[in-house]
Amino acid sequence: MKTFSAKPAEVTKKWVIIDATGLVVGRLATLVAMRLRGKHLPTYTPHVDCGDNVIIINASKVVLTGRKRDNKVYYHHTGFIGGIKERSAKAILEGRFPERVVEKAIERMIPRGPLGRVQMGNLRVYPGAEHPHEAQQPEKLDIGAMNRKNMRAA
């Protein structure tokens, strides 16, 4: 039997919606990264974007285990000398764009490169319950029911 290799024209993409309320960030990110890459499919091909389109709602209500909410630090650089800045996960989750914690966790699990950037484009993260993708009729995916460790009381 010959090895199957998916062609970009043969790939059919599904739309999946995930409610992130009470979900542990790392566990959510691993499952979403796998879906974005298409590794949950038997027809997975490493060099083709064969993953699903993923919508995450209520991203501001995710949970970090242990003391990570206070102690985890996110760094960025302004580009100027001595311009390294840091913010805690708590500051980001309580700030203007709380969905960035989830986006960064997923982004760091996707390979860097042209294909990784395309796959990250298939991710939509919203801090609240509203999203503009009703026309795509997304299929609901309950990550909390997959494993009891995926859910944590806030």
Curated annotation (Swiss-Prot):
One of its GO terms (biological process) is translation. GO terms for cellular component: cytosolic large ribosomal subunit. The keyword Ribosomal protein applies. Keywords: Ribonucleoprotein, Ribosomal protein. CDD domains: Ribosomal_L13. One of its GO terms (molecular function) is structural constituent of ribosome. The keyword Ribonucleoprotein applies. Pfam families: Ribosomal_L13. Gene3D superfamilies: Ribosomal protein L13. Coiled coil: none annotated. This protein is one of the early assembly proteins of the 50S ribosomal subunit, although it is not seen to bind rRNA by itself. It is important during the early stages of 50S assembly. Part of the 50S ribosomal subunit. NCBIfam families: rplM_bact. Belongs to the universal ribosomal protein uL13 family. This is Large ribosomal subunit protein uL13. It comes from Rhodopseudomonas palustris (strain TIE-1).
